[in-house]
Swiss-Prot record:
This is Acireductone dioxygenase. Its cofactor is Fe(2+); Ni(2+). The lineage of its organism: Bacteria, Pseudomonadati, Pseudomonadota, Gammaproteobacteria, Enterobacterales. Catalyzes 2 different reactions between oxygen and the acireductone 1,2-dihydroxy-3-keto-5-methylthiopentene (DHK-MTPene) depending upon the metal bound in the active site. Fe-containing acireductone dioxygenase (Fe-ARD) produces formate and 2-keto-4-methylthiobutyrate (KMTB), the alpha-ketoacid precursor of methionine in the methionine recycle pathway. Ni-containing acireductone dioxygenase (Ni-ARD) produces methylthiopropionate, carbon monoxide and formate, and does not lie on the methionine recycle pathway. InterPro entries: ARD, ARD_bac, RmlC-like_jellyroll, RmlC_Cupin_sf. Pfam families: ARD.
Length: 180
């Protein structure tokens, strides 16, 4: 179940707000300029789908986003617990960073935790299958896939180069809860 927990950005001792209600989550995030929607990830992908399988199954969703915003490229990120690079990738994504473009993800399997540092708050968004999130360009954030990751998401980009991060150097991510 998708969830949103909001903390003050000076520590994670006590949540300021939390909910698993998709409408309430959308309302809170939309107020911050973050798009959050529940889409249908209902295509059969098999146990360990190839990127081509995922892209073919969800081309209709990609086409909608491209038509709406003019995105230029897309790919699939899929991570499983048996991936030998899981620790290195988790460490990389756990560092606060920004992008020069919106970060758009459509989760078609599993879950991951987006943590958005907006103003004086941290918004922890547990995204699961069926969730579409679009984090505005320039928003400091980090992503936790957990120690035993299991997710597949379609990534949509404004530029043909794909994922380009600008790390802030802030240690803020270390102060907030992570996925197990």
């Amino acid at each position: 179940m998708s969830a949103l927990t909001i903390f003050a950005d000076n520590g994670a001792s006590e949540p300021l707000w939390q909910s698993t209600d998709a409408d309430a989550i959308r309302e809170q995030l939309n107020a911050q300029g973050v798009r959050f929607e529940r889409w249908q990830a209902d295509r059969e992908l098999g146990d360990n789908p190839t990127p081509e399988t995922v892209l073919t199954a969800y081309q209709h969703a990609i086409d909608l986003l491209v038509a709406e915003k003019g995105y230029q490229s897309w790919d699939v990120i899929s991570m499983r617990a048996d991936n030998p690079q899981k620790e290195a990738l988790r460490d990389k994504f756990l560092n606060e960073h920004t992008h020069g473009e919106d970060e758009v993800r459509f989760f078609v399997e599993g879950a991951g935790l987006f943590c958005l540092h907006i103003g004086d708050k941290v918004y922890q968004v547990l995204c699961e299958k069926n969730d579409l999130i679009s984090v505005p360009a320039g928003t400091p954030h980090w992503f936790d896939m957990g120690s035993e990751p299991h997710f597949t998401a379609i990534r949509i980009f404004d530029n043909p180069e794909g994922w380009i991060a600008n790390f802030t150097g802030s240690p803020i991510a270390e102060a907030y809860p992570r996925l197990a």
